[in-house]
Structure formats: structure tokens, C-alpha cells
């Protein structure tokens, strides 16, 4: 049995993860939660801060906000247990901190936990270099009106994957305005916020005579929860410090 502490247990994703752990993952048990809202109805105790939690566990799973990062890393270092980061909105300084922390603890990070997005991300490594010479590349990401970070972490993941796959130097733009001709080396990430859109990411390769679109739509938050719980199963026995991702969980390398 994999024992999990869930940070952000009272939020929307916390509810979904808690439910799926009980109904679909017999080898995973949420043994405690961490959240500012300690009054949520859960089958496990909820603590306001990591340092208040004294429950024995195997994996610390975070689905909250970027500002929880340092306290979670500190807790994982103290307990010598793996940390799974599923939050987005990290700054450049945060990412550097994550990189350094992975030298001390087993640290898993993914901008998107869905199997589909991670397949798309790996597909882009092959597709982008083939199409770049004759196609312009644009991205559109759409999310609900409560999402606070823009562009989404997933959009940045896809954009950076495309950049890293190309031999030429490219520059990212975030939205367009004004009067200017598009430059060949631009990759523009466009953001939409509205309604209850769970998550929609579209990569557009626009050529003179044809357009190729690679699109992923999340129609249920279950896809993120399933990925997160699979990551918990994968990370439970990890003791060696290092960086881990969904590529490791899904054994993606194509």
C-alpha cells in the first residue's frame, strides 16, 4: 500500500484525487491532507501546514499553488520522502530552486499529469523539426476563468519542447498586438480564460497550402488525478535523489 500525503486536499483537484484513490486505486491510500481549509470533509486528517503533520507516509503529492514550494521541499528533506509537484505558476527562481532540491531528494515535477498531454509533448519532439522550415508555429491554450497563471504551465511545456527540438534559435511571444509582420523564428502562445474550460491546448503548424493542428482537450479533471496517482505508485520506492517526470512513469521515449 502506497501511503500519500496530499497537499491541497480541500481544492477541486484534491477532491477528485481523494475520490479516485478510494474507488480506482486499491494500492494507494491518502493518509493525510494539508490545506488552509482544514474543515473539508475527508476520510483522513487535514493539517494546516506540513510541519504540523506527523503521519507516516511514502509520497508527498502537491496539487496546490506555487507559493507552497519551499515548505514542501523542506518537509520532504526532513522526512527523506519523495515529493511530487503538480502545481503550475512557478517563477524562474522557483524552477532553479526545484533543480537544486532534486540533488537532495527524489523530486517529480510535471506541468500536466494527463497521459494524453505527455504523449503530445513527446510527439512534438519528432514533428516540430520536420515541419519548422515550411510552417509557422502558434499555440493556443484555453482554461476556466479561475485560473490565475498565464500562459498555462502546459502551454509553456509544449512551447519549450518545440524550441528544444529545433536547431535554430527561436523566441516566444505571449499574445499579439500592434502592427508588425510575423517573423519566422517566432512561436506565439495565445491565452484564453473563460467559463469552466478544464484545459484545452492546441499547437498549430500553418503552411502556405495546409494547416496541421495537434489538439488536446481535457473533458474531466479525472485525467490529471489518474496521472498523479500513477506517479505516486511510481515514486513510492524511490530513494535516490534526482529529477523525475511523467516520461519516467509512462516510459515515453520516442
Curated annotation (Swiss-Prot):
It comes from Clostridium perfringens (strain 13 / Type A). GO terms for molecular function: 4-hydroxy-tetrahydrodipicolinate reductase; NAD binding; NADP binding; oxidoreductase activity, acting on CH or CH2 groups, NAD or NADP as acceptor. GO terms for cellular component: cytosol. NAD(+) binds at residues 8-13, 35, 86-88, 110-113. Keywords: Amino-acid biosynthesis, Cytoplasm, Diaminopimelate biosynthesis, Lysine biosynthesis, NAD, NADP, Oxidoreductase. Its main location: cytoplasm. It comes from the Bacteria. This is 4-hydroxy-tetrahydrodipicolinate reductase. Catalyzes the conversion of 4-hydroxy-tetrahydrodipicolinate (HTPA) to tetrahydrodipicolinate. Belongs to the DapB family. It is found in: Cytoplasm. Pathway: Amino-acid biosynthesis; L-lysine biosynthesis via DAP pathway; (S)-tetrahydrodipicolinate from L-aspartate: step 4/4. Its EC number is 1.17.1.8. The active site is at residues 143, 147. It catalyses: (S)-2,3,4,5-tetrahydrodipicolinate + NAD(+) + H2O = (2S,4S)-4-hydroxy-2,3,4,5-tetrahydrodipicolinate + NADH + H(+); (S)-2,3,4,5-tetrahydrodipicolinate + NADP(+) + H2O = (2S,4S)-4-hydroxy-2,3,4,5-tetrahydrodipicolinate + NADPH + H(+). It is an enzyme of class 1 (oxidoreductase). (S)-2,3,4,5-tetrahydrodipicolinate binds at residues 144, 153-154. The keyword NADP applies. One of its GO terms (biological process) is lysine biosynthetic process via diaminopimelate. CDD domains: DHDPR_N.
Amino acid at each position: 500500500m502506497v501511503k500519500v500525503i496530499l497537499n491541497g486536499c480541500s481544492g477541486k483537484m484534491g477532491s477528485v484525487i481523494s475520490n479516485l484513490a478510494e474507488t480506482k486505486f486499491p494500492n494507494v491510500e491518502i493518509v493525510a491532507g494539508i490545506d488552509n481549509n482544514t474543515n473539508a470533509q475527508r476520510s483522513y486528517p487535514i493539517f494546516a501546514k506540513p510541519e504540523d503533520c506527523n503521519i507516516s507516509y511514502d509520497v508527498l503529492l502537491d496539487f496546490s499553488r506555487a507559493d507552497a514550494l519551499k515548505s514542501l521541499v523542506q518537509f520532504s528533506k526532513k522526512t527523506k520522502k519523495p515529493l511530487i509537484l503538480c502545481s503550475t505558476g512557478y517563477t524562474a527562481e522557483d524552477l532553479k530552486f526545484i533543480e537544486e532540491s532534486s540533488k537532495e531528494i527524489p523530486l517529480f515535477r510535471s506541468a500536466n499529469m494527463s497521459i494524453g498531454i505527455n504523449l503530445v509533448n513527446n510527439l512534438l519532439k519528432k514533428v516540430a523539426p520536420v515541419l519548422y522550415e515550411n510552417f509557422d508555429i502558434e499555440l493556443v491554450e484555453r482554461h476556466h476563468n479561475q485560473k490565475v497563471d498565464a500562459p498555462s504551465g502546459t502551454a509553456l511545456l509544449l512551447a519549450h519542447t518545440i524550441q528544444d527540438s529545433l536547431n535554430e534559435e527561436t523566441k516566444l511571444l505571449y499574445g499579439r498586438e500592434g502592427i508588425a509582420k510575423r517573423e519566422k523564428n517566432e512561436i506565439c502562445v495565445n491565452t484564453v480564460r473563460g467559463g469552466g474550460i478544464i484545459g484545452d491546448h492546441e499547437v498549430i503548424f500553418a503552411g502556405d497550402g495546409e494547416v496541421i493542428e495537434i489538439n488536446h482537450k481535457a473533458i474531466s479533471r479525472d485525467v490529471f488525478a489518474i496521472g498523479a496517482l500513477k506517479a505516486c505508485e511510481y515514486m513510492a520506492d524511490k530513494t535516490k535523489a534526482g529529477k523525475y517526470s511523467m516520461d519516467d512513469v509512462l516510459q515515453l521515449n520516442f
